[in-house]
C-alpha cells in the first residue's frame, strides 16, 4: 500500500493543490534531478521508486533506485559523500522531482570521482558530433 495518494482525475488539484501526489511511471519510478544547494550546479539525474522517496523524506538523505543494479541506493553511503536534502520540489504534473542537496565529504557526486555526472559537452561541428571534457571549474 502506497503512502502517497493516487492522483485524481482533476488536473487542477495536481497542478495547483497542496497534496503531494508523485506520479511514478509504469516501472514504478520517478525522475530525480539533483543540484548543489549552494551554487545550483547540476550534479546528476537519477530515479526513485516509492521506497527511495519515502526514505529520502524520512531521513533527509537522498536515496535512489538503481535501474542497472535493481536495488535501493543510499547515495554516498560507500564514499562518504552523502547527499543531505535541503529542498525537494516537484514539477507541475508531479512526475519529476528536483532535489537541492549539500554533498558531504570531498564533494564528488559522480561514480567517476567528478563533482557532476555532466562533465562532457556535446559539440557539433562540420557535420560531426563529438564530446569534449568540461573541467570541474567550468561546471
UniProtKB/Swiss-Prot annotation:
* Biochemical pathway: Amino-acid biosynthesis; L-histidine biosynthesis; L-histidine from 5-phospho-alpha-D-ribose 1-diphosphate: step 3/9
Q: Which cofactor does it need?
A: Mg(2+); Zn(2+)
* A GO MF term: phosphoribosyl-AMP cyclohydrolase activity
Please indicate if the UniProt record lists Cytoplasm as a keyword.
yes
Q: Tell me if Transport is a UniProt keyword of this record.
A: no
Q: Where does Zn(2+) bind?
A: 92, 110, 117
What GO CC terms are in its UniProt record? cytoplasm
Q: Where in the cell is it found?
A: Cytoplasm
Q: Read off the InterPro entries from this record.
A: PRA-CH (IPR026660), PRib_AMP_CycHydrolase_dom (IPR002496), PRib_AMP_CycHydrolase_sf (IPR038019)
Partners and quaternary state?
A: Homodimer.
Q: Which PANTHER family match?
A: HISTIDINE BIOSYNTHESIS BIFUNCTIONAL PROTEIN, HISTIDINE BIOSYNTHESIS BIFUNCTIONAL PROTEIN HIS7
- What this protein is called in its record is Phosphoribosyl-AMP cyclohydrolase
Task: Record the organism.
Answer: Brucella canis (strain ATCC 23365 / NCTC 10854 / RM-666)
Q: What is the lineage of its organism?
A: Bacteria, Pseudomonadati, Pseudomonadota, Alphaproteobacteria, Hyphomicrobiales
